[in-house]
Amino acid sequence: MENTESVKVDTIDNVQNNTRSEKLAPLKPITMGSFENPSSRKQNQNDDTYEDEPNNKFSRGPEFMYSPEAGADRLSKLSQSMLDEIRKLGYDTIFRKFVDELNSDLQSQNIQKESFEDFESKWHRIVNTICNQFYRKNFGTPYEQRGRSSTRFGQNSSPNMSSELTTFIQETPVLQIIQVFIDMLQQDGNYNGKQNVDEEQIRYSRFMYRSFVTLYHKCNGTWKPQNNSENRGGNSRSNKYQRNSNRYPRNMPNRSSKSYGRTASSGRKYSQVDDETVTDTKNTYRPKPRGSYRFNKSSNFTREPERFQNSRNSSGHGRMN
């Protein structure tokens, strides 16, 4: 716990280097690279940020990630055939392929959980764990696949992908691939210019968009967990109990009674109790004796039936003879 702040500082400084020892092949970079196809990528070794014009308003700031216009601009730099192939195969299939590439990268480097050669290897292990957990949570259960075919990935565990898409997944930085999912889901969750809109698919796209945004922040080290009771407002359990405690004060007798607030025919509320009538609030309920349904209702809670009293055996149990 003492080295938490130092690790956070090293995350920003060291992840952008993306350098490994000369003996091993380099791992997949995590930070954003130039947003274009690997086949048509320009040679620029010092570029580890989003490559665009200097005056492009989408290059920096929050709109760089969340603006629909910025997302459409980034997707326009990718081939339309590859985007159509991603939608055809499904986001779950593409993301599973992406996770498999992360696993193979770590296995090729012989990186173990117990030992790390440098900080970058450790950070790749963390990102790999985060992405695997994300896949199991969002694509591994039928509940998260609502509005989609739940057997799409199960029947096609090794889909046939084009060489262009395979190269893109293998050579593109981690955050850039996640950004592609964010931009495509943002476009899928937009109503503008669409006919015969599938409401369920729209809700699913928006749900997954928010999930991938959280994944993006977790992978680059900027995600901050928040208290659910503060975010959910009235839906949180703590606020629910607080509302009930204000409604039913502690000094009110029988505050858990279902008849609270009801009005009798005489106009008096059941919750209004005089001191003269209150005798013992702790023992107002008496258990119903066994077999008492055979007798008059007036004798159920006032006294035991005479026949029931005479039928007690030596063990003390009230059995009928």
Curated annotation (Swiss-Prot):
Residues 1-63, 223-321 are annotated as: Disordered. Residues 1-11 have a biased composition (Basic and acidic residues). It comes from the Viruses. Residues 34-47, 241-269, 310-321 have a biased composition (Polar residues). Residues 227-239 have a biased composition (Low complexity). This is Uncharacterized protein R562. It comes from Acanthamoeba polyphaga mimivirus (APMV).
